[in-house]
Amino acid sequence: MQLRFTALAAAAAFAAAAPAQDVAAGRKKAEACVACHGPNGNSTQPQFPILAGQTTRYVYLQLRDFKEGRRKEPQMDPFVKALSREDMFDLAFFFAAQKVRPTPFKPDPVKAARGLKKSEETLCTMCHLGGFLGQNEIPRVAGQHYEYVVKQLKDFKTLKRTNDAGNMTAVAKTLSDRDIDDLGHYLAGLY
């Protein structure tokens, strides 16, 4: 009960602190993101995440973490340095409003079945929700690029990525390389 109250309080505080939605301003600002993240946040390059359909809170917090150095990705540095808080919210509102497009990735059915089983064993839907659509600061991982999912899980496991309050790090440490590969196949095949 306490955890639910804390999550609701955090979401309410975030909503109160957010400026008014300006998807049009976000669309204009997102022009700088197209080369890597694709039109409307639907990246066609598997090493870059699909931003379309992510939650506003998740996109904003990731941009803030990149800007403040809590999350590191050299390719993002030049883009986030000049972003204001308002810019980050505009981008977050824009990407959250976009429709996710399927990728051409074809998951291996055997690996995807093992990935489903592993996701149930590790209780992934406790945070990412049923359908893996994400919530609040938890990302949508359904339909995300296989390569990106695998890299992020490995980065959490090896502590290259730590901007998650330890939740994903704790889970990823329990995963074998095969588990990570299987989860990548499973998640990339969801829409």
Label every model-predicted segment.
Residues 23, 27, 41-72, 77-83, ...:
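Gly/Gly-Pro-rich "capping" loops immediately C-terminal to redox-active cysteine motifs
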Residues 21-40, 103, 107-130, 145:
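Sequence/structural segment immediately N-terminal to covalent heme-attachment motifs in c-type
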Residues 81-103, 147, 173-191:
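C-terminal capping alpha-helices of c-type cytochrome domains
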Residues 9-20:
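Hydrophobic h-region of N-terminal signal peptides that target proteins for export
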Residues 1-7:
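Bacterial N-terminal signal peptides that target proteins for export
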Residues 66, 94-95, 119, 156, ...:
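Conserved hydrophobic/aromatic "anchor" residues
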